Amino acid sequence: MLVDTKAKIGVFSIALGAYLPQFPSLVPEFQSQYEAFKKTLPDTVEIVDGGMVTTKEQSQAAGDLFRAADVDLVFLQLLTYATSYNMLPAVKDLDVPVVLVNIQKLKALDYDHTDIATWLGEGYACGAVGEMVADLERYGKRHAVITGVVEGGDPGVQAEIEDWCRAAQVRRRFRDTNIAQIGRPYPGMMDLYIDESNLYRRMHLYTKQFDWEKMWAIADDITDEDAIRAKAQDILDTFDIEGGGSIEEVWEMAKYVVAFEKWVKDEKLGLIASHYDGFAQGKAGVLDSMLIPAFSMLIKQGTACAVEGDIKVAMAMSILKTISGTGQLAEMYSLDFNDDIAIIGHSGSGDADISDKKPTMKIVKVFHGKTGGGYLTQFYPYTGPVTYLAITQDGDGHFKFIAAEGVNEEGPILSFGDTNMRTRFTCGAREFVNRWSECGPTHHFAAATGRHIDTILKVAKIFNVPVDIVTR
């Protein structure tokens, strides 16, 4: 990624303090279990360690630590029964979900030979799960529960922990990076319009505004020929250029990509939304003609780039790229009623990681519906499971996610330079369009290879955003 971010995960464990002097063997047992649990978190996140909590004061200290670190998520390991006052001081001032980890050490107790200490230490993690959720509900806190076992390993538990960590990466990415808006949204596409202050309030994402005049000159100071040549080769390695291509032919494009990469790093940009509606002449025309492949090179490196100035779809692309490794701009493109297939795609920049074969680049005289002409890029999404995500708003500015899963199938696609794919939905193409549209999406959405609704639901819980699931 051009701009790296790392989720901050608050972690602590709780046990009833009254047990410890009664059964001293529980102290090393619980400490060992807690240390083992922390090792199950992936190294892609930063652990903010609140320690093992058995008193209200320790819980308050953990909460102070979590607030100071601005954690993106909290894992609470339940070691045995504990009262909720061990939990609430640590989380009452946080606005992130608390994931209750109810992992029992043993698959089952030896009923004939288990004493009280062994029961409390190795078979009683479930004792307070309901109590914790009851009080989290009363405090208006978002929550989830993971139940499983340590003995013999539990792949389901490990998968859930890693999935929550992936979801938490989105919050950190939105908080630690910015979105650049270059120009303004496409005139009249009112579904794309957005209040940037409300965006920052609800999604923690700050908008930096840029004028096209600055973009036209962005490459003027790029003189490192080795860097330009290397980027030109990177472009040739990424795309098959219609009619062939050479380093010399993509030199100017490579120069702009090098400049954009520096700009992204300097401004800490995780997302870009742009639209140009001026005269495509002179330097403006040069940049406009090569912007689509240039921004595709940024998407390849983790910076979501959306056309038509659509900030909301840039967020959807960034979410999918962060949780799945792919994030492609899309919209309803056509319907194949003969095969009951939805054709889904879009013109503009795309994600090379979603393409099953080398993407193509071709020159067109006009960008349909837009000013100027130049390079189009077409990507060829993998067949198999696919996830779609749209982000929309209600009349009060609250955000909503709309998600669907389908299957991309082999078959004929359009080949005039726009990315498009053939998606089959379990509900059928007609019903999919009806259901999807009734959810009130913007006309843009994002696509990712694989099935990711479960992770999207976690992202939504972290941001406290509702989700409409259209079909799975």
Predicted segments with their positions:
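C-terminal catalytic subdomain
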Residues: 296-415
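Short, acidic/small-residue loops that bind anionic groups at enzyme active sites
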Residues: 89-115, 120-128, 293-308
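Long, internal scaffold/assembly segments composed of regular secondary structure
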Residues: 231-323
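Periplasmic-binding protein-like
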Residues: 71-80, 99-101, 269-274
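Short beta-strand elements in bilobed, periplasmic/extracellular small-molecule ligand-binding domains
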Residues: 31-55, 142-148, 205-211
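Short, well-structured alpha-helical segments in soluble
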Residues: 59-71, 88-90, 257-266
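Extended hydrophobic packing segments that form well-structured cores
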Residues: 370-472
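Cap/lid and interdomain-hinge subdomains that line or gate substrate/regulatory clefts
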Residues: 2, 7-9, 107-232, 236-239
